[in-house]
C-alpha cells in the first residue's frame, strides 16, 4: 500500500471505537441530491460562500432571517459551523452580525473506491476536499475474505486520524448496487450479493453508504463541482470511461438512481477494426482493450507481461508516454478510442437529450490531446442542435471525488441527523454538559 499525502497532519478517529460493532441498520442509502431542507440549505450556503453573514445566507437560500438564525444556532451548537468575530463589520452589534464558516478541522469522512484492480481509500473534510489518499490492490479472492481484508485496511487507515472524528464511510464500486442494504453484485470481481455495507459498518463502527461508482461521480459533479447548482437544476448526462464504461443522469438537482440499479451502456454497439473487441462499447474502449491493441501492434515491448500482473495503469502510462513522444501508431490508437467514445456519447445525447453533457474517467482525462477527436465524433454523430461537451472538473481524481461525496452525502442532506447517526452529536453534548453545569 502506498500513500499520497495532501496534508502534514496525521490524524485519526476518536480512540475507543475500534471494537464497537454496529448492526446493519447503520447502512444508509446515499443522498446524491441537493437537499432543500433548511439546515442543508444553510450549511450548503456557508460551505460555498463562507465566511458569510446571516443576511447573505438568507438572500442566497430564500429563507427568512428567523429561519436562518435558528439553523445557524443549531449548526454552531453541533460544532459544524464556527463564528468569525474577527471578520465582523466595524460597528456591528449582536452575534447575528458575526460571519460564520464551516468548522472543518474536527471532522473527517472516509471514502473507499473499490476498482477492478485498485482500491483507493480517501480521507475527506467537510468541504469535500481530499486530505489524503492511499491505494492498495483490490483483493482477488472471494467476497467474504476480500471485504474482510478491505475493512482491515480501512480500519488501520482510520487510526491515523487521531485529532478528527470520523463521521461516515462512503463506498463506491461497479456492478449492481443495492444502496438500501449495501449488498453488491460485481461480476468482474466474482461477487454475488456481497455484503459490502454490513461488513464495513460492523468493522468500522460507523454509518456506511454504498453507491454505484458512476452515480457517485455524477454526484460529485453536482454537489462538489465548481458550478453552483440549484435544487431545481436542469438535466445533465454524465458519461464515464476507463476500465469500465457507464452513465448517469442528473435531473432537477438529483442523481437519478433507479431502484433496480443503474442501467448499462457496456453492450452499446460500436465498430473499430483497430481496437477489435466484440462490437460492444466496453470491450472496445476499456484500458484492457486499448492495451490488447497495443500488444497486437507491438507499440510497447513487454507490455503483455505487465498487464497480466495487474500493472494496467503503468502500461497505459507507458502508452501515453510513447504517444506524446511522437509514435504515430500510439497516437492513432488513442485517437481511435476517442472517436468511438465520442460517437457513443453522441448516441446517448440524442437518446436522452440532456441540457448538459459531462464526461469523466481516465479514458477522457489522461490524454486530453484526444478530446478534439471526442468532440469531432460527438458533433458528427449527433443529429440534434450543436452542444459542447464539458470535461469533469476533477480530472484524474474523479474516483476519489465520487467516494468522497458518498461519504458526505448524508451530512449534506441532513447535517444534524448525520451527526446524530454517527454518534458525534451525542458525544459533543456529553463533552459540553460539564461546562453548562459549571
From Swiss-Prot:
Q: Which stretches are tagged as biased composition: Polar residues?
A: 1-12
State if Magnesium is listed as a keyword: no
Ranges annotated as DNA-binding: 52-73
Q: Give the record's keywords alphabetically.
A: Activator, DNA-binding, Repressor, Transcription, Transcription regulation
Q: Any idea which GO molecular function terms this record carries?
A: DNA binding
User: Which family does the record assign?
Assistant: Belongs to the ROK (NagC/XylR) family.
Q: What does this protein do?
A: Positively regulates the expression of PE13 and PPE18. Can also regulate expression of some other genes. Plays a role in modulation of innate immune responses.
What is the protein's given name? Transcriptional regulator Rv0485
Species assigned in the record = Mycobacterium tuberculosis (strain ATCC 25618 / H37Rv)
Amino acid at each position: 500500500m502506498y500513500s499520497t499525502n495532501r496534508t502534514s497532519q496525521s490524524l485519526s478517529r476518536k480512540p475507543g471505537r475500534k471494537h464497537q460493532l454496529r448492526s446493519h441498520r447503520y447502512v444508509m442509502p446515499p443522498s446524491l441530491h441537493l437537499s432543500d431542507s433548511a439546515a442543508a440549505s444553510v450549511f450548503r450556503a456557508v460551505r460555498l460562500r463562507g465566511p458569510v453573514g446571516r443576511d447573505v445566507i438568507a438572500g442566497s437560500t430564500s429563507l427568512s432571517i428567523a429561519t436562518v438564525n435558528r439553523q445557524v444556532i443549531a449548526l454552531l451548537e453541533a460544532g459544524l459551523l464556527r463564528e468569525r468575530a474577527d471578520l465582523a463589520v466595524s460597528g456591528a452589534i449582536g452575534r447575528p452580525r458575526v460571519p460564520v464558516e464551516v468548522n472543518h478541522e474536527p471532522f473527517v469522512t472516509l471514502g473507499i473506491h473499490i476498482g477492478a484492480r485498485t482500491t483507493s481509500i480517501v480521507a475527506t473534510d467537510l468541504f469535500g476536499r481530499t486530505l489524503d489518499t492511499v491505494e492498495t490492490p483490490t483483493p482477488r479472492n472471494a467476497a467474504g475474505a476480500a471485504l474482510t481484508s478491505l475493512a482491515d485496511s480501512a480500519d488501520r487507515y482510520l487510526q491515523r486520524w487521531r485529532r478528527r472524528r470520523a463521521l461516515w464511510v462512503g463506498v463506491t464500486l461497479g456492478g449492481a448496487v443495492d444502496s438500501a442494504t449495501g449488498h453488491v453484485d460485481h461480476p468482474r470481481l466474482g461477487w454475488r450479493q456481497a455484503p459490502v455495507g454490513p461488513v464495513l459498518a460492523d468493522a468500522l463502527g460507523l454509518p456506511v453508504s454504498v453507491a454505484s461508482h458512476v452515480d457517485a461521480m455524477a454526484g460529485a459533479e453536482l454537489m462538489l463541482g465548481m458550478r453552483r447548482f440549484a435544487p431545481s437544476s436542469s438535466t445533465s448526462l454524465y458519461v464515464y470511461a476507463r476500465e469500465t464504461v457507464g452513465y448517469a443522469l442528473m435531473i432537477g438537482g438529483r442523481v437519478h438512481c433507479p431502484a433496480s440499479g443503474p442501467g448499462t451502456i457496456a453492450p452499446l454497439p460500436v465498430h473499430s477494426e483497430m481496437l477489435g473487441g466484440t462490437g460492444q462499447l466496453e470491450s472496445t474502449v476499456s484500458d484492457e482493450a486499448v492495451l490488447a491493441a497495443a500488444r497486437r501492434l507491438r507499440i510497447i515491448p513487454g507490455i503483455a507481461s505487465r498487464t497480466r500482473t495487474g500493472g494496467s495503469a503503468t502500461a497505459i502510462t507507458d502508452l501515453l508516454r510513447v504517444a506524446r513522444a511522437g509514435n504515430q501508431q500510439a497516437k492513432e490508437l488513442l485517437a481511435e478510442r476517442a472517436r468511438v467514445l465520442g460517437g457513443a456519447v453522441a448516441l446517448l445525447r440524442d437518446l436522452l437529450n440532456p441540457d448538459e453533457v459531462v464526461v469523466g474517467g481516465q479514458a477522457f482525462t489522461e490524454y486530453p490531446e484526444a478530446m478534439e477527436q471526442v468532440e469531432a465524433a460527438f458533433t458528427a454523430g449527433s443529429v440534434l442542435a450543436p452542444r459542447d461537451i464539458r470535461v469533469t472538473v476533477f480530472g484524474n481524481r474523479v474516483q476519489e471525488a465520487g467516494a468522497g461525496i458518498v461519504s458526505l452525502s448524508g451530512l449534506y442532506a441532513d447535517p444534524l441527523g448525520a451527526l446524530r447517526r454517527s454518534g458525534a452529536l451525542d458525544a459533543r453534548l456529553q463533552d459540553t454538559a460539564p461546562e453548562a453545569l459549571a
